[in-house]
Every structure is written in C-alpha cells, then in structure tokens.
C-alpha cells in the first residue's frame, strides 16, 4: 500500500471522494495515486491540508517523494 493510499484510508475517504475534493476524475486520481502520472502543485497542497488533519507535521516531501 502506498503512503498516500494509507493516509487516504485513514481519512476514511475513497478514491472517488478524493477525486471529487480535488475536482478531477476518478481515473485521473487513480493514475496519480498509483504514480502513473504526477499530482500538480495545487493538488499536492490540497492533499497535504487534508492529511494534516490527522498528522499535523506532514510534509509534501514525506507524502509524495519518500
């Protein structure tokens, strides 16, 4: 399980719900979560804000690059 998927599950969100929050399609979100395509900066910041609710000290590097 990817780190991002783990945090999404801890937030109690489905891929569809994450896609809706980011205003992208489910297919696009799936491709990004599985690292087939990259998230853009706006999406990275939005995801960081969501994850910060459960892990306030999370960094973008930790979420997307480790």
What is the role of each PLM region?
Residues 1-10, 58:
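A short, Lys/Arg-rich alpha-helix, primarily the initiator
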Residues 5, 30-31, 48:
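Key DNA-contacting residues within the recognition helix of helix-turn-helix
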Residues 5, 16, 61:
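Residues within the helices of the helix-turn-helix
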Residues 6-9, 23, 34-36, 52:
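Residue-level detection of the helix-turn-helix DNA-binding "recognition helix"
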Residues 8, 19, 48:
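The alpha-helix within a helix-turn-helix
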Residues 12-31:
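Short alpha-helical DNA-recognition segment
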Residues 42-58:
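DNA major-groove recognition helix of helix-turn-helix/homeodomain DNA-binding modules
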Residues 60-66:
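Short amphipathic recognition helices of helix-turn-helix/homeodomain-type DNA-binding modules
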